[in-house]
Amino acid sequence: AAPEWADYVKTGSHRERPPVQADWWYVRSAAVLRKVAMMGPIGANHMAQQFGGPKDRGVKQNRAVSGSRNIARTILQQLSSCDLIISKHNLAGTVNLGKILTGTGQSMLDDAAHAVRGSAEEKYPGLSGF
């Protein structure tokens, strides 16, 4: 579930307004889960960079800035509490390398992809070759 502060927070310093979609937290959580599956092991800082963008600095040139690390960290904690992701450590167990997908998380992503495959093939006819 989305935290109570999710209705008022911006998704990064590069944004001027908070999100307008009512379900943006759940869409972001699904995107984070997919990114962990594709890019893992990945941490909260690198995840925030994935959701960053150009900051408007007025007359000066735009610069790339990270998204909100609190949002990324909170979503990673929620996914971890649901046993969809776990922390990966080095062989000695002393360094946390980031989050990786569990078997439960992978099966959830596979089920979701299988559920929308039919409608995706109807919308994009050439998709069946992949």
Where are these regions (language model features)?
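Short, amphipathic alpha-helical interaction segments positioned at domain boundaries
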Residues: 94-130
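Conserved, aromatic- and glycine-enriched, well-ordered alpha/beta core segments
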Residues: 60-67, 73
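Long, low-complexity, charged/polar intrinsically disordered regions in eukaryotic proteins
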Residues: 1-30, 34
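Short acidic, hydrophobic short linear motifs in intrinsically disordered regions
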Residues: 41-63
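Basic amphipathic alpha-helical segments that dock to polyanions
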Residues: 47, 72-82
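A short, conserved structural fragment
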Residues: 80-92
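Short amphipathic alpha-helical elements of helix-turn-helix/winged-helix folds
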Residues: 31-39, 50
